[in-house]
């Protein structure tokens, strides 16, 4: 099919107005300040209206991650369906209390039944940062058995990685073929599951939960954290997503 590349500032200059796409992948810059450039800031604020790209709300100016996500959502094909994969830092999951722009955007994802899966990725996957990152998967034509639910996958373990022979900046690992295959299988099964995980510091192997399926209703009252030792757990903080 036709292939086109557009050079420009995504948030401030939409090069694909009126177009929709069936598959979209993105790794937007982490923590980009969308308020520095006045032209971009004005365009973003202008699109924060009913029917605009950013109608759900605006995050704080020091992190535009959820603006990039909303931009992609605005390009979803409502007839034939679309799937989005986007790598984000932890801010979109944890920042903002109830009523904030962050919270309103997250609420939109649930109200429209778009959020399908969030994968916590291992650290040291990127050249310029060693932070924990998350792969979000969204769909607008989800099958009945996946609707109103979100799957959290904890892939932030050495079992999912391959050590590089030479570091590339802060990038020390990449997701291994076996790790990617297991993540894909867990995503397809869309249910709770456990794996044997070895912890680096102790060398001990534990059989732990690496995937947790939540109803949207439960997710409204739940946040997810991944820390050392890397495991997934849930804390009840009702002021985050309501």
What are these model-derived regions, one by one?
Residues 2-8:
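Conserved SAM-binding strand-loop segment of SAM-dependent methyltransferases
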Residues 12-242:
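A conserved structural/catalytic subdomain of Rossmann-like adenosyl-cofactor enzymes
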């Amino acid at each position: 099919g036709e292939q086109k590349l557009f050079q420009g500032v995504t948030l401030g200059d939409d090069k694909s107005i009126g177009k929709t796409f069936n598959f979209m992948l993105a790794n937007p810059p982490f923590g980009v300040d969308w308020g520095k450039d006045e032209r971009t800031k004005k365009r973003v604020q202008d699109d924060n209206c009913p029917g605009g790209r950013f109608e759900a709300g605006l995050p704080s100016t020091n992190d535009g991650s959820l603006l990039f996500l909303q931009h992609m959502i605005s390009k979803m094909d409502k007839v034939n369906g679309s799937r989005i994969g986007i790598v984000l830092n932890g801010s979109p999951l944890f920042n903002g209390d109830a009523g904030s722009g962050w919270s309103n955007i997250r609420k939109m994802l649930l109200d429209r039944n778009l959020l399908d899966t969030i994968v916590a990725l291992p650290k040291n996957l990127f050249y310029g940062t060693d932070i924990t990152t998350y792969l979000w998967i969204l769909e607008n034509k989800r099958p009945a058995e996946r609707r109103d639910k979100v799957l959290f996958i904890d892939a932030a373990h050495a079992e999912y990685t391959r050590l590089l022979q030479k570091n590339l900046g802060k990038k020390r690992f990449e997701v291994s073929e076996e790790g990617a295959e297991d993540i894909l299988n867990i995503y397809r099964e869309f249910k709770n599951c456990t794996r044997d995980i070895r912890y680096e510091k102790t060398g001990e192997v534990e059989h732990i939960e690496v995937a947790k399926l939540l109803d949207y209703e439960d997710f409204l009252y739940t946040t997810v954290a991944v820390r050392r030792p890397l495991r997934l757990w849930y804390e009840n903080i009702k002021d985050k997503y309501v």
